[in-house]
Structures are given as C-alpha cells and as structure tokens.
A protein has these predicted regions:
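A general marker of short, structured functional hotspots
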Residues: 10-11, 24, 57
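Short clusters of hydrophobic/aromatic residues that line enzyme substrate/ligand-binding pockets
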Residues: 14-15, 74
Length: 181
C-alpha cells in the first residue's frame, strides 16, 4: 500500500483566531513531528495543505495577512504543497490527481481542525476511493459552544465524536504510535 500523509491547515492563521488555545498544542506538535518523521523514514510522501481565502479581506486566512504559512515547528521538507479554499483538501486543488499519478491509495490525515477540515477531507478521500487513516492525536481542535442551546463541548469531546462518526465507515482511527512503533 502506498501512503501519503496530509498535513492540513497547520498554519499561522490559527494564532490570529478568537478560539486559539495553547492547551493541547505541545502534544499536537510532538505527535505531528513524530508522524512526519515516521512517514519520511518509510519513504512515504508528506503533503502540506494550506487554507486560504481572499473573499474576506481582514481574515487571517487571507494570503494578504501574511499568516497563510506553515507553523514554525514545521521546518522540514514536504513533498508537495496544495492550497485549498474550502473545507476539504480535494475540491479544486488537484490533490486527487496528484495522489493517483503517484500511485498512492491510502492517505493519513493530520492537522487543524479535527472536526472541520480534517474530518471533511477524510470523508471526501473515502468517497474518492482512498483508504483513510485518521491520526486523531496528530490533529488539533478547540472547545466550541453550540449556539442554539449554549452547550459547551471540550476539544477532547469533539475528537471522540469525530472518531465515532468516521470509524469503520470513512476511516481507520489511528494514533501516532501506530506509525512510529
């Protein structure tokens, strides 16, 4: 099986959002760094995905902000970079074609935010026929509040929910240690 690791939206833009929290960042950075090293050691492709949108001038995701760049801890070489403007890494990016040209049939998902661009990319990848390994501890998300009723959900609860809805249908749920051991 030929694999590629997708490192989704791990970019400076998030430092400038109202929901940014450093609570889980150290573990996320450690796990993602280990995961990238394991993929590179095993000669698998590592793909950087950046989210940009130019329709909102003052957004930290607008390229003019200067924040649409990898977080500093991602100082390693990537095999390819794709830019997206929607919630998944496939729509209008050329990623699927590139993966197929490189005979890649399995993608591992990592990055920011677990339940948004990472989960959405996993679902689309599955629909496109790729095997998907969702590396939950190499994803990052933040606490959220459900607007209609005010209920708060912690980041760890959101991750569990993401695993629940992806497992056995869209993805195999993995941990970083599954790749480095």
């Amino acid at each position: 099986m030929n694999k590629a690791l997708l490192v989704i939206d791990t970019q400076d833009s998030f430092y400038h959002t109202p929901y940014w929290s450093v609570r889980d960042v150290a573990d996320f950075q450690h796990n993602l760094t280990q995961l990238i090293a394991a993929f590179q050691r095993n000669q698998h492709k590592v793909i950087k995905i950046l989210h940009s949108r130019d329709d909102v001038p003052d957004s930290p995701f607008n390229p003019a902000s200067g924040f649409v760049k990898p977080m500093a801890f991602l100082d390693m070489q990537f095999d390819k970079t794709f830019h997206k403007s929607v919630h998944n890494a496939f729509t209008d990016t050329g990623l699927a074609m590139w993966l197929k040209r490189n005979n890649i049939d399995c993608v591992a998902i990592s990055g920011i935010r677990t339940e948004q661009c990472c989960e959405t990319t996993a679902r689309v990848a599955s629909d496109l026929g790729f095997q998907v390994e969702f590396v939950t501890d190499a994803t990052l998300t933040f606490d959220m509040q459900h607007q209609p009723n005010g209920q708060r959900f912690r980041a760890d609860e959101i991750k569990v929910r993401t695993e629940l809805v992806l497992a056995e249908r869209f993805a195999t749920i993995c941990k970083t240690q599954d790749f480095v051991a």
